[in-house]
Structures are given as structure tokens and as C-alpha cells.
Amino acid sequence: MDKQLVLVIDFGGQYNQLIARRVREHNVYCEIVPYTYSIDKIKEKKPSAVIFTGGQNSVYGEDSPRMDKEIFDLGVPVLGICYGHQLITYTLGGEVMGSEIREYGKTDVTLDSVCELFEGIDIENSCWMSHTDRVAKVPEGFKVVGHTNVCPVAAMANTEKKIYGVQFHPEVLHTPFGEQLFSNFLFKICGLKEDWSMSSFAKEKIQEIKDIVGDKKVLCALSGGVDSSVAAVLVHKAIGKQLTCVFVDHGLLRKDEGDQVESIFRKQFDMNLIRVNAKDRFLGKLKGISDPERKRKIIGEEFIRVFEEEANKLGQIDFLVQGTIYPDVVESGTDTSATIKSHHNVGGLPEDMQFELIEPLRELFKDEVRAVGEELGIPHKLVWRQPFPGPGLGIRVLGEVTEEKLEIVREADAIFREEIANAGLEEKIWQYFACLPNIHSVGVMGDGRTYCETIALRAVTSSDAMTSDWARIPYEVLDKVSRRIVNEVKGVNRIVYDVTSKPPATIEWE
């Protein structure tokens, strides 16, 4: 039996990957394709439902994304969100106009409870808006099923053809009824079943890797983080000793991390593991470099060079495994979304790379990666290890990277992580770390004046890394961390705590 497919058409909005995540949370498989995807290709995929995402354009713009009207003749339910809502209106003969009053952020909305999309949802509710244009007149066959004080058509429905549009963003957590809305759309309106899970994903991916690799050799870029670890074990399950894991110790790791990685994968998983000590090589390349994008590119390119050298020693190697996940791809920019910052797994790859890439986790969000890890029998402690970027401490030392600065941030980070664990908060906080922002400040220690480094602490709550909020760590924990770092880490006299959400900030400082 063919797998059910919800096709998410990407029009370039900032929350598009979240839509896919919300669908998958209901154990329904979905894929994201750009709006440039032809109607013939869409037909070939035989989707059970289609979702139009938001976007940054106006439907009346000359170069604005469009969609072939024939998509509405496929006979499958369609849900349009924000720009997608306006595009449905425009394409089917309704009217869209600019609004004198824009709606951004939390907004009160009134819904029509008779509409199946809003079944089981309170009529008077709140939602997350982010738009300038609005629907002024719905297309023929549609009726208004939601409004706000500013937006007279916050939602519309053609129940006969099962085409729906909402101006707000049900995919973000700030819309409290979003989960129920997606449930109603997927199960009540589309009649889909829960037939996709991380267990089925792992089984299918293992078979896929076997088919792709055959009897060829594979090299895995192992960092010891969650993503590369799950990718390595997944590939190892598929091809066993055909996989060689190369762990590049670039001198940018957290405290004791290199030894831990070697112990876990060599002894516990019986993998072919090569540990390469390349600290001097990486620090030499980074000398005098302060620009964060250049640092990322240098680290990414040097990683690949090391792998190529190791591959040459091993003989014929055909494939390289990377732990790339969905947010990596999104933050590197797609055809329809602006580049936020190049990701080390995507943007730093040299054009003359000698391997074919295997990225088994490319479609998954972080929580899904963890679930796959649990399915594969990876120890819980490793599966829930803190996210750590490929460039490592190289992007947690702002400005030029030196061994002295690395030692400062490494020790401060170890103290922070230790006290978070002591407080029982390690699985309650999505990510937490220390960084060195390259700021000196005056202080007083003993009877003397100091002029030392500042350490910034960053801790966020999230479920997918697409959006996050700063973690409300108890004051007594922050107090203990601050006192310990200042007293135990030489060269530091001030601690600051980052209280910025994402957006507007990213989780990492660089």
C-alpha cells in the first residue's frame, strides 16, 4: 500500500519547516517542495493533501510566487496559511488588498465552530499573525469562518471542495489551538491515518542505505554530537564494517569530549573508528580570522580535507555520511528563503569534494533524530546530549580563535553544564552553553583592579531549534555558576546571561 503523503508547498515563509513538523507530530508523512515544483511532478507524487505555506511577498507583486490553478482540480484537500491563504483567494478569483493596519504577533480571533476545521476549538481564541495584505473578498463557493478586529477574513472555507485558508499561523506554538486545527485537517477533513513513525523511518532508511551503498565503502564524519552519532549508528546498522568513522579532534571540542567519543563508539558500538588529532592544523588556519562566516567556511573545508586524506589512506571510499538535519538546511537558505547563516554541514562544503554525500537525517527535526536514536538502542544519555555545532567552540569564541581563549570558554562551559546537571535541568533545557564574546571589562578582585574577559551564558527552551525562548534558570543556579566561573577560570571577571529569544536572535552567537 502506498504511503499517505501530505505535500507542503514552500512559498518562502520563515515558519515553513514548522508546518512539516506539525504534520509529522500526528504521525503523517509529509514532504516539502518549492512552489516552482511543476503540476506534473505534483501529480506523480499522488499527494493525499496539500498545504500552502506563508511567504514574504504580496500576491500582486510582479515576481511573486504563483501556483498552477490545476492543483485545485486534483480532488485533494488544500490548506493555505498566510500567503497561501491569500494565494488561494487570488488564484480562484477573490480579492486581496493591502491593509492600513498591519497585524503582527498575538491577536484575538473569532472562529466559526460549525466549520470542521475548527471543531473542538473555542470560538473566541488567540492566534499568531504576521501579515500586511489581507483577503477583502473570498472566491466564489467560499464562506468566511474566522475574523479579527483588523482582518475580516482571518479564515475561509469551501467545504464542498475541501479548500481552506487561514491568515494566521497555526504551526507556531503561539497559536494555542494550532495542534487541534492540524488534527482536524489531517484526520477529519482529509481522512488520513497515522502510518508514519520513527520506527518505520529507521527501517526504511536502513534498507535505503543498503540499496544505495551496495558493497562500497563509506566514511562517516563523526563528531560525537547527537546528529552525527545517530547518523553513524543508522548507517552502521545498514552496512556494518563497510563503514569507517573518522573523528576529527580539531581542538575545538568541549572538555573531555574527545576521549568520551572514542570510548563510546569504539568500545560500545564496535565501530571502525579513526581519531585524528588536527588541533594545530585547524588553529593555524583560523589564525587572524575574526569574521564568523569565514571561520565556518574554513572549518568546514578543513574538515573535508582531513576526511579526504584519511580516505586516501583507506583505499577506495565512495560515500561520506553527514548528520545534516532539517534546521541545518533551512538556516543555509533554500530557493525560497533568505540565508540566515551558512551551516557547517551545508554551506562549508568545497565544490571539489570527492565523495557522494549520504545524509540520512536530512528530513528530520532534532526531536525526531532523538526518537530515531532511541529506536536504534543508542544510550539515553548520548541521545539527549547537548546540541553542539560542527565548528565547535570555534564559533563560541567570538573574534579570533586562540588556544588561550578556547581554554577559558571550555572551562566555563564545563562548569555551566555541571551545575545544570546538578540542578536536574539537563533535559528540561533544549541547549545551554558558555561563549566568549570578546568583551573585556573592569573589575575588582582582592585589592586590585582587573581588566578581564566576559563570559556569556546562553540557555534556551525549544522543541525544534526553529524558534526558541531563553530559559528561566533559577537564580540560585545562575548565582552558583557565576561565582564558580569567576573563581575557578583564570582571566574572567564578569558573567552575563543572554535573555533573547529566537527570533530575533539565533541560538548561537556566531
From Swiss-Prot:
Catalytic activity: XMP + L-glutamine + ATP + H2O = GMP + L-glutamate + AMP + diphosphate + 2 H(+)
Superkingdom of the organism of origin: Bacteria
Disulfide bonds, paired cysteine numbers: none
Keyword field: ATP-binding, Glutamine amidotransferase, GMP biosynthesis, Ligase, Nucleotide-binding, Purine biosynthesis
EC number from the UniProt entry: 6.3.5.2
Pfam families: GATase (PF00117), GMP_synt_C (PF00958), NAD_synthase (PF02540)
Record bears the keyword rRNA-binding: no
Molecular function via GO: ATP binding; GMP synthase activity
Active site per the UniProt annotation: 82, 169, 171
Keyword Acyltransferase: no
Pathway the protein acts in: Purine metabolism; GMP biosynthesis; GMP from XMP (L-Gln route): step 1/1
Record's GO cellular component terms: cytosol
Top EC class for this record: ligase
Segments forming domain Glutamine amidotransferase type-1: 5-195
UniProt-annotated binding residues for ATP: 223-229
GMPS ATP-PPase domain mapped to chain residues: 196-385
Function: Catalyzes the synthesis of GMP from XMP.
Oligomer status and interactors: Homodimer.
The protein, known as: GMP synthase [glutamine-hydrolyzing]
Source organism per UniProt: Clostridium acetobutylicum (strain ATCC 824 / DSM 792 / JCM 1419 / IAM 19013 / LMG 5710 / NBRC 13948 / NRRL B-527 / VKM B-1787 / 2291 / W)
